[in-house]
Amino acid sequence: LTCYKGYRDTV
């Protein structure tokens, strides 16, 4: 998963 500016996206 990717963490970007406090945003977590499960891909």
Swiss-Prot record:
Tissues/organs with expression: Expressed by the venom gland.
Single GO term (MF): acetylcholine receptor inhibitor activity
Recorded GO CC terms: extracellular region
Localization per Swiss-Prot or TrEMBL: Secreted
Annotated function: Binds with high affinity to muscular (alpha-1/CHRNA1) and neuronal (alpha-7/CHRNA7) nicotinic acetylcholine receptor (nAChR) and hinders acetylcholine binding to the receptor, thereby impairing neuromuscular and neuronal transmission.
Protein family according to the UniProt entry: Belongs to the three-finger toxin family. Short-chain subfamily. Type III alpha-neurotoxin sub-subfamily.
Protein name as it appears in the record: Short neurotoxin N1
Organism, as annotated: Pseudonaja textilis
Lineage, broadest ranks: Eukaryota, Metazoa, Chordata, Craniata, Vertebrata
